[in-house]
Amino acid sequence: MHDIDVAIQINMLFLPPTNELIRVDSNSKQLNQPQQQQQQQQQQINNENENSINNQENKENNNKDNNNNNNKEIKQSSEWGSKFSSLFSNMTKKKKSNFDLEMDAIKDAFLLNKPINNEEGLLIYSLDKSKKYIHSLSELDIGYVYLTEKETPIIRQNEDEVILANKVIIQANTMKRFSIKGILQSDVTTNALEIFTKRKMSQGVLFLEEDGSLCRIFYKIQDLITDTIYCNQDDTVMLQKLPNNEGIRFRFRGSFNREQVQQAMLAFSQPSDPQTWKRTIILREQQHHSSQSFTGDSVASRFLNKLSSKTKEDEESNDLKTKRENTVLKLKNRMKIDWDWKYTSTSVPIDQEPPTFIDNMVNRVREKISGSNNKLSDLLSSAKKQPQQQPQKDVTSSSSSSSNSSSPYLDSVDKLVITTNDSSSSNPLPDFDKLSLSSDDKVNNNNVQIENTTPSVPPPPPVGAPPPPPPPPPPPPPPPPSTLKLNRNRISTPKKPNNSGGGGGGGQLTPLQKKMRQLHWNAIPREKLKETFWDNLSPVKGNDNDQTLVESWFSLSPMAKEKMSKENLNNSNNNNNNNSNNNGEEQSLSDSGNTIVISKIIILDLRRSNNICILLSQFKLSYGAIKEAILCFEDGKLSVEQLIALDAMLPISEEEYQSLSSANYQSIEQLGNAERFLIEMMSIQHLQQRVQTYLFKLEVCSLLDSIEINNNQLSKAIEQLRNSRKFIKVLKVIFHIGSILNRGTYLNSTKGFKLDSLSKLSETKSKDQKHTVVDFIEIYIRENQPELLNFYSELDLLDKIPQSSLENILEESNEIENKFKQVDQEIQYHQQLLTNDNNNTLSSSSSSSYDQSKDTYLKVMSPFYDTFNTRFITIKQSTQQTLKQFQECCIYFGEDPQNITSKDFFSNIVKFSIAFKSSSNNAKKSLNLSTLNSK
C-alpha cells in the first residue's frame, strides 16, 4: 500500500452515493423524490446557513443540479421538509444548552474529519440505538438521521453535505478539499478557530477583508466588524460577525491527510467487513512489492486519474488568491517592513508537511505531458529512458534546494536503473517512501540544466573543461566523461570558453539565468484578453543589453558590499593555500569562491517573529533609540499607537528569555530582527508594566474628561426627570386609559405600572388597525389637558444622554482606578530600587546597580500620579453620587434598581416621547389639511 501511502492533499472522504432515495428516519418509507426537488427543499431548510461566504461553492453546485434536472422529471413531495425540520427540532430540545449543543457539534465535526485508525471504524448510532461503524461519511445513507457518541444528531443531506445538529455543515463538493461551516456563538467560534489553526486567539490572528483591502491582527473574536467577511491569507478560514448578536458565520477549509485518503479508497470499494478491509490492504502491499502489475480491482487508479484534472473551483479562486497575496505585499511595503525577517532556514516547520512524491509528480505530469492521459507508470518509464540508453555513462542530476533530499533521490535513481535492467518488460512502481523528488528538479532528455533555488545565492560559476557541442535533437549524444560528473556533494558545470581563446569548436552552453525579484501584478484572464488592447499589441523588440540591465537592477545576487568582501576573501584564500572551507557553519563557498551564504539565527516561533516584525514597522527608530525612549520617557517621543504596538509584543515569556539569553552567536547582526529587538528590550526591568503605565499616562486625560462629561449629563437628566410634573400627569392619563382597557381582568386591580409598559402602547392598535394607544392618548390630552402636549420639553436632557450607560461609566471608573494602582506599585518598585542602590554604593558591580541617571520613571510618573489621582478621586465620588441618585429615581418610578440598567430605564421614556411627538405632529398636519379643504 506504499504506492498510495503518501500525504495526498486531496479530498476523498465524500464519495458519490449509490442510493438516490431520500429517507427521513430509520422506519420511514422511500420517497420517490428526484434530485431537483431534493435540492429545492434543502435550500429552503438551510436558507439561514447560506451567505456570501458560500456563494462560490453554491454556484458550482447549482450549475451541476441544473444540468441533472434537464434529464429528470419532477415530482413534488411535501412531507420531506416538515418531517426533517420537526425531527431535528425534537432531537435538539433535549437537556443540552445551546452552547453545549454547538460545542458538541463542532467537536464532532472535527472528529469526523480525522483519520479513522481502527479496523472497526467510527461508532454511529441510528435512531433506534442500533450501532453502525463507518470508515468515512460516504458510508452514511442519504436522508437517514444518526447520532454520534455525544448524541449529536447527524444526517447526510445529499451527496457531498453532512449536517450536525442543524448547526454545523461538513461539505465536500470537489475532490480537492473539505469545508466545515455554520453559524455559532462567539465563544464556540473562538474554540473552533483555535482547534483548526492550532493557535490561541490571544496570540493574535492575521485576517484580511474579503476584498483584500485591509490586513489586521485580531486578538478577540468580538473585535470583528459586523457584516464584514474576513479570511486568512491561504483562504482556509473565513469569518463574518452577524448583527444583533446572532453569532459568527464561519467556514474552515482543509485537506485530508494520507490516512483519510486510504479510508476513502476503502469506503469506495464498499468493504463488507474488517476482513475485506484487511484483504484490500494485503493486495496493495503485494502490488507494491511485486514486479508484476496489480491484477485486482485497482481502486487507486480511479483516484489517481482525478489528480490530473484541475477543478473549476480552483480556476475561479485564482484571481482572489492573487489579489490577497498582492494585498499582503502592498501592506508590507507600505509599512516598510524589513524583508530580512523572513526565514531562510532549510528546516521544515512543525505544522508544515514536506512536499510529497505525488504532489511533485503531478506537477511534472502537467509540465511535461500536458494534455495526455498516460498513467503514472508511463511517466516513470519516460524518466528511465536516458539511463537505459547510457548504462555505462555517469548520470547528471539537478540539485534541489535541500541537501537532505539529494541523497535519497540518487539512491532511488540507482535502484530504478537496476530494476530497469533486470526487467525491461514490466513497469513496477518504485518505493515511494524512499523516492523523494523535489519540485525544483528539472530532468530534460536533451541536456541537463542546473537551477539554484536558494533566493540569496547566485548560480554557481562555470568551471571545468571546454564545453561539448550543442545538443542535436533527441536522442542526444553522451557528454564527455570529463565534462559532467555526478557528485553528491558538488555539481560541476562546463566553463564558458573565453572569447579571446581559440579552442574547441562548436557552440557554447547558455549561461544559467539569474533569479530575479518578482513583479506581482494582477494578470488579465485569457478569456478577457480579446476585449483589451493587449491582444493585438506586438511585443517590444529587446536585446541582450535589456536583460543585462534588468538583472543588474533586480537580480537576487549579493549586493556590491558583499561582492567586495568576497573578493577580499578570495585573495586571502589564495594566500592561505585554498583554505576556504574553514567556516562552513555560517559561510559556504563554491568552487570559485564567489558564493557566500549567510544565514540568520532564528530563535522565536515563526508566527511570533512575524507579528513582532509587523508591529515594529510602525517605528522609525533603531532598537537602541526605542530602548532609550522607554527609559527616558517624554511626551512626544512615543505615540499612543507605538505604545500599543509595544504592549502587543509583550510579555517576553520565560522560555523566550532563556532561549535568547543562551543563544550562541558571535555578532548580534547574525540574529533576526525580532530576536535583536527582544534582546535589546530584555535589559529593561518591568518592561511591560512601564509600557502600560506610559500608555495610561497619555490616555488618562481624555478618559477622565469623558467620564466627567458623561456623568454630569446623566446626573442632570436624572434630576430633570425626577422634577418633571407634566410627565407625572401624563403617566396618570395613561393609567386612566389603561384601567378602562383592562376592565374586568386581573390587570385592573393594580395601582400603577412600570415604565417598560410605555413601549407596549405603540403595539396595541385600534380595531381598524390604523391607530395605536399613543394616538388615543395624544387626542385625549389635546382635548382634556392641552397643557401636557409639550411634556417632553421638560425632558430634553434625556435625548442628550450619551450612549454609554451609568454601568459603563462605573466600569470605566473601576478600570482607571486599577490603572492608578498599577502606577503606584511601579513607583514603589522603582523607589525600592533606588533605596537598594544607595545601600549598595560600595558594590563592585556597578552594572547591576540601579542607575537613576538613565531612568526617568520616578521623575515622570510621580508628579503625574499625584496630580491626576487627586482629580480621579473627585470624579469617582461624583459617579457614586450619580449612582445613588439613579437608584432613588428608579424607586420613585416603581422600578427595581437591581434589575434594570440606566440605558433601559431612560430608553423606555425616550421611545414613548418620540412616539407621542410623532402622533402630535401627524394630528397637526391632519388638522391643517382639513382647515385648507374647508376653505
Swiss-Prot record:
Residues 52-78, 380-511, 561-590 are annotated as: Disordered. It comes from the Eukaryota. Residues 35-76, 702-730, 803-834 form a coiled coil. GO terms for molecular function: actin binding; profilin binding. Keywords: Actin-binding, Coiled coil. Residues 418-428, 444-454, 484-499 have a biased composition (Polar residues). InterPro entries: FH2_Formin (IPR015425), FH2_Formin_sf (IPR042201), Formin_Homology (IPR051425). Residues 444-505 form the FH1 domain. Residues 456-482 have a biased composition (Pro residues). Residues 384-407, 568-583 have a biased composition (Low complexity). Residues 431-443 have a biased composition (Basic and acidic residues). Formins play an important role in the nucleation of actin and the formation of linear actin filaments. This is Formin-I. It comes from Dictyostelium discoideum (Social amoeba).
